[in-house]
């Protein structure tokens, strides 16, 4: 009975993540339509995604400084955040006619999403023991991949107006908010003690070697991940156009397959591996494979479509397979009473890096072409692999040593 309830809550948390995060790349998937309707430039297209990332960072940093994820009932914070993300996306679909309106709304969407993804991690951790936490985080991150890729699926299934795509994503996020409010509950491993705000913990946690190495590994992973997700469809489209290949019409489906299907499967497999063989070897293996894909990407740019798709499936799976290991490792090494704050701070810094690479990739493409643009991402997984290889095999929490104060 207890096991059934645990599995049910995990599944519901993952479902809410898929629904709530479907708004993340909704505007990015609509870029081809917006180019003709708004005269959108590559820089403007980059800002449609980067503004979400910046909003996410601001929201996550604010949440971390206020210890919000540890002070508010997580299911309520999740529901309100998903509803706000839905409202901002719906407003963009109904009222936006250019970047002057779209970018502020995308920024606010990012702020709202800071209460969806990190809080989902906290809730998933509350329903997980250390022996299966990697698998649980893998499922959650697979939900992130599916939700993020969903707009590509909508675009790939037919020539829908971009406003319809945005409204569909907004509706899904609103449904996720209702589910979070009505049926999601915190698990038995959630520390429910009230926390006196201690913003210093955001900095103090980096003093511990295991936490620091885990974070560096995560930052290397993030240097690659979101820039790849943002510009993958452009990479595919440019290569197919150079080949004069009819498969260019199916760019959205290829992107969904690599990001959503392969990414989801890779997340679950990576989470399982982190439980079976350890966080460190699971993360290092994924980082090495995705780094190799970065280096090999120019050779597949104009490869036959079947070869390209197989390559992108491997890359899509490996680029996110290590995420569960990072989240799990941090939840096990950071102060257990402030795990929500630690995860939020880690995520905020990682997403700040994504703003840099999201802007740099199209700049590189303008200089050397899309064939070589993704070489820019290779240093991330290389640095991440080195950091994770140095991680102690059995890192432990530093709760007893942290300068944190509580009300009882």
Model-derived segments and spans:
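Extracytoplasmic gate region of multi-pass secondary transporters
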Residues: 27-28, 210-264
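Flexible cytoplasmic inter-helical loops of multi-pass small-molecule transporters
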Residues: 181-203, 397-405
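C-terminal ends and interior cores of transmembrane alpha-helices
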Residues: 83-97, 289-302
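C-terminal transmembrane helical hairpin of 12-TM major facilitator-type secondary transporters
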Residues: 279-326
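Helix-loop-helix hairpin linking two adjacent transmembrane segments in secondary transporters
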Residues: 139-184
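Conserved MFS/SLC helix-loop-helix module at the cytosolic interface between two early adjacent transmembrane helices
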Residues: 60-96
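Helix-to-loop junctions at the C-terminal end of transmembrane segments
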Residues: 60-73, 267-278, 365
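Cytoplasmic helix-loop-helix junction between adjacent transmembrane helices
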Residues: 105-142
């Amino acid at each position: 009975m207890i096991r059934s309830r645990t599995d049910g809550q995990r599944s519901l948390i993952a479902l809410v993540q898929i629904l709530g995060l479907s708004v993340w790349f909704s505007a990015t998937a609509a870029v081809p339509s917006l180019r003709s309707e708004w005269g959108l430039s590559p820089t403007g297209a980059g800002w449609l995604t980067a503004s979400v990332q910046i909003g996410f960072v601001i929201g996550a940093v604010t949440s971390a400084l206020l210890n919000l994820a540890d002070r508010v009932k997580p299911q309520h914070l999740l529901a309100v955040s998903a509803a706000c993300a839905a409202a901002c996306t719906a407003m963009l679909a109904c009222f936006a006619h250019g970047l002057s309106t779209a970018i502020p709304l995308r920024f606010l969407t990012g702020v709202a999403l800071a209460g969806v993804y990190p809080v989902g991690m906290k809730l998933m951790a509350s329903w997980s023991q250390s022996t299966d936490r990697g698998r649980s985080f893998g499922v959650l991150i697979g939900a992130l991949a599916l939700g993020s890729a969903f707009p590509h699926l909508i675009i790939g299934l037919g020539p829908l107006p971009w406003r319809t795509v945005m409204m569909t994503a907004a509706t899904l996020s609103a449904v996720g908010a209702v589910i979070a409010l009505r049926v999601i509950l915190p698990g038995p491993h959630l520390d429910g003690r009230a926390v006196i705000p201690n913003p210093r913990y955001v900095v103090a946690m980096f003093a511990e070697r295991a936490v620091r190495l885990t974070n560096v590994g995560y930052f290397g992973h993030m240097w690659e991940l979101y820039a790849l997700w943002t510009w993958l469809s452009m990479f595919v489209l440019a290569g197919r156009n150079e080949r004069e290949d009819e498969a260019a019409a199916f760019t959205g489906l290829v992107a969904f397959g690599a990001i959503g299907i392969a990414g989801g499967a890779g997340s679950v497999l990576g989470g399982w591996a982190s439980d079976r063989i350890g966080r460190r070897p699971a993360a290092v293996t994924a980082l090495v494979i995705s780094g190799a894909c970065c280096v090999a990407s120019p050779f597949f740019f104009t490869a036959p479509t079947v070869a390209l798709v197989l390559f992108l499936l491997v890359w899509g799976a490996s680029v996110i397979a290590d995420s569960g290991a990072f989240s799990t490792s941090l939840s096990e090494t950071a102060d257990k009473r402030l795990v929500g704050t630690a995860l939020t701070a880690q995520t905020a810094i990682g997403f700040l890096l994504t703003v840099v690479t999201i802007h740099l990739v199209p700049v590189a493409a303008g200089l050397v072409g899309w064939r070589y643009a993704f070489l820019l991402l290779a240093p991330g997984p290389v640095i991440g692999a080195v950091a994770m290889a140095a991680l102690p095999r059995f890192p432990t929490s530093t709760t007893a040593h942290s300068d944190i104060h509580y009300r009882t």
